[in-house]
Amino acid sequence: MREHARRWVLCAALALVALVALPQAALAEAKPVWRLYNRYDGDHMWTLDKAEYDSLVKAGWTGEGKAWEAPHKESMNEGFVYRLYNPWSGEHLFTMDYGEYDQLGKAGWRKEGTAFESAKVGAPAWRLYNRWLTAGTHLYTTDKAEYDRLVKLGWVGEGVRFCGKLPESRLKQLTYYRIGLNSLIGGDDHLDMLSTGVSASIRGDTLTLTPKGDRALLVKDPFGGSAGDETIINSAGELSGGKLSFRLTESTAYVVEYDAPTDAMFIFRMIGREELEKRRQWRGNVGTLGRYDEVIVDARGNVVSLLLR
């Protein structure tokens, strides 16, 4: 009983520290959204205010760093995300639904105004509800696999509540990629083994490959012909202005693979997390032997597997 009371007091104390006014000026320009975790009641909170973030960390919250960036242009803005506080449980709730925001306010939740803006496209934030908990009953995640797993465990899935704009990141390792016959090459029609420098970056949910120097990206069909600027076969990519762009989603990974030389072409396609795990296990079993030159990129832009023949 004493331990329970002590934890409740700590929980309440941490929650009270978070009762500060949200600075509306912070919405004027793009800023990172910071995530915090209250280990005493399981509450997660997001804030645009770095000073608030630092203050809560000093008060005992666990700072979990940058979650995403709030959009700064009106054209990228889907709407506002509102923040509420439950004085009885210490929980913070985030919603774009003003009706829900207003209804909970009338039910006794503290309405804390606009927390940040939701992006039109980006990383969806999924909301879950645990009916058995008395504090920290809601959880938000940008990982669809985690969302699905928790629903199977009994959490109530409440769908996407807002979207975050992922900051631009550079792909690790993908700065020089060896390629071969009938594949994606850099401005040269020689049919022997070629090499090209390709840089890659992710902004929002788009992966862009850009050739270095004055080279252009060409897509070669199995017979050595150029596919020009048409959408690439067997892919979700499009050529535009010498760059190659692909849409990424949070629940999938990207595969760039090169098949046998006799009938090969570069294939960019999406795979699910289960398939990604199978490929990782297969890599561990066979080492570096295999039929593909392959790069696997997760939705956050990290190269999780790199195999070159």
Spans of model-derived segments:
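Bacterial N-terminal signal peptides
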Residues: 11-21
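N-terminal signal peptide c-region/cleavage motif recognized by signal peptidases
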Residues: 23-25
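Solvent-exposed hydroxyl-ligand-binding patches built from regularly spaced Ser/Thr
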Residues: 171-292, 296, 300-309
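Feature targets compositionally biased, intrinsically disordered low-complexity regions
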Residues: 1, 41, 59-64, 78, ...
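Bacterial N-terminal signal peptides that target proteins for export
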Residues: 1-12
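Extracellular glycan-binding segments that recognize GlcNAc-based cell-wall polysaccharides
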Residues: 27-170
